[in-house]
């Protein structure tokens, strides 16, 4: 509805993590809106055995706020060497996590924990690029390989020395993969 309201007839969707989950959902519901789809560090399904982890995060945010979630999230989102080096990127993300409203975080956790699109994504016909950090724990390479197998003609790029925020850990390699893909479709 937003794209239509803005008068945007078609778009190149680039979605990271939950943004990739949203992109898959929208591409299934309104395929005519997509010139291409880039799915970054995301998944088409969260396994049922992961639900208790998501429930625990919800409980923590409800009862203690965001602070207790900060360091664990950073450890999942960045490789250990990158996190240890710290720097402005890690500090910026640390601040973003701290300033996330718990209610918004809880809603996202609940949406993510119920995701199950794998059996439907073969219907995605838009040219699709899948990018994943080789060390992504939350949406691992195996999940990207499933999407790559199911979405006909999709391309898979695995970035070395990167976890869940591969765009931040390996910005040059990420941007090269992204612009190379989009450059052929603009």
Q: Where do the PLM segments sit?
A:
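Conserved alpha/beta-hydrolase catalytic His-Asp/Glu region
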Residues: 45-53, 63-123
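Catalytic active-site module of serine/aspartate enzymes centered on a nucleophile-bearing elbow/loop
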Residues: 154-186
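Alpha/beta-hydrolase active-site loop
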Residues: 1-3
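Short alpha-helix in the alpha/beta-hydrolase fold that links the catalytic acid
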Residues: 126, 140-149
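Acidic catalytic loop of the alpha/beta-hydrolase fold
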Residues: 134-139
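Active-site helix-initiating loop/hinge in glycosyltransferases
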Residues: 101, 140-143, 170
């Amino acid at each position: 509805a937003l794209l239509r309201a803005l008068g945007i007839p078609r778009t190149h969707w680039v979605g990271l993590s939950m943004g990739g989950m949203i992109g898959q959902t929208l591409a299934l519901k309104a395929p005519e809106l997509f010139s291409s789809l880039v799915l970054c560090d995301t998944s088409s399904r969260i396994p049922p055995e992961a639900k208790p982890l998501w429930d625990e995060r919800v409980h923590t945010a409800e009862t203690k706020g965001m602070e207790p979630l900060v360091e664990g999230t950073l450890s999942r989102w960045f490789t250990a060497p990158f996190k240890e080096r710290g720097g402005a990127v890690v500090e910026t993300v640390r601040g973003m996590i701290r300033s996330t409203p718990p209610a918004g975080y809880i809603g996202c956790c609940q949406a993510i924990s119920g995701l199950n699109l794998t059996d439907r994504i073969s219907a995605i016909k838009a040219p699709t690029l899948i990018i994943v950090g080789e060390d992504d724990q939350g949406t691992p390479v195996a999940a990207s390989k499933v999407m790559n197998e199911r979405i006909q003609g999709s391309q898979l790029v695995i970035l070395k020395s990167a976890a869940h925020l591969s765009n931040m850990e390996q910005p040059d390699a990420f941007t090269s993969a992204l612009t190379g893909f989009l450059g052929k479709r603009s």
